[in-house]
Amino acid sequence: MTAEVRAQFGDYPDGRDDPHFISRTVILDKDDRVFLNADHLSNEGHLTVELLDEQFRPLKGFSGQDSAVLKESGLRQPVLWHDRGQLKGFEKPVRIRVNWAGQDSRNVRVHAVYVSPQ
């Protein structure tokens, strides 16, 4: 299933102690991957991406210290968890959480999150 989840904002969400957004639920097919369209990413301002279950609970191996980290800007930047791009073995819908991170994260813009096989 190809799905597109667009952020409700492109800029850093001011006024939040933990700047992030969470997608609606997404049903993943065995060959699906997550991609981000984002800019102004760097070592000092980057994004982390986590997977949550339907009840917003972090999924082991895809959240916290296992979160994917994006430090390069681009239109279809692949999100990789421990060098794994394909999201196999998910029988239930998931949510995608994108977090702003780093001392210069206020400059980072997120335009879209894509879920597709390629």
Language model: regions and residue ranges:
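Intrinsic-disorder/low-complexity, polar/charged segments enriched in Ser/Thr/Lys/Arg/Asp/Glu/Gln
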Residues: 18-23, 31-35, 76-78
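Edge beta-strands of jelly-roll/beta-sandwich modules across compartments, strongly enriched
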Residues: 104-114
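Catalytic cores of secreted or luminal carbohydrate-active enzymes
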Residues: 1-21, 46
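Extended extracellular/luminal ectodomain segments enriched in beta-structured repeat modules
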Residues: 28-35, 91-93
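Beta-strand-rich binding/interaction modules
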Residues: 33-37, 44-57
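Short beta-strand-to-coil "C-cap" segments at the C-terminal boundary of structured domains/repeats
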Residues: 1-3, 112-118
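Extracellular carbohydrate recognition and processing domains
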Residues: 58-90
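Short beta-strand-plus-loop segments that form exposed binding edges in beta-rich domains
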Residues: 97-104
